Amino acid sequence: MKRLFSLLAAVMFCASVMAQAVIKFEKTSLDFGKFRESKVQVGEFVFTNTGNKPLVIQQAFGSCGCTVATPPKAPIAPGAKGVIKVSYNGKGKFQGEFKKPITVRSNASNSIVRIYILGNMLLDE
């Protein structure tokens, strides 16, 4: 009886591990190019749930207050696409080239993914 229970528990564990969401981004960086500091930059990262369970984005956040990421609130079905909207407000920041990470946390097998925004901010004239 113990063997049967152990075998059943092992099979159920393996099945739960195999059934997971997987997040795959179309691109992992977004280049805003050259822009003036007074112009807020906006963009989006498109991703697909390539797993077989619904994908839930728990958090998406930048490394500083100048970067805002807005993930979808609803779960993403297997095979469906979703979008994380991002904005960068460089007002009052240092001019020049930058590369800012955005950390995405989800229930996917790859539960933490980093995507990046980059650009070259110029001072206003």
What name fits each language-model region?
Residues 2-10:
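Sec-dependent signal peptide recognition
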Residues 47-51:
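Asparagine-centered strand-capping/turn motif at beta-strand->loop junctions
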Residues 84-92:
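Short, hydrophobic beta-strand segments
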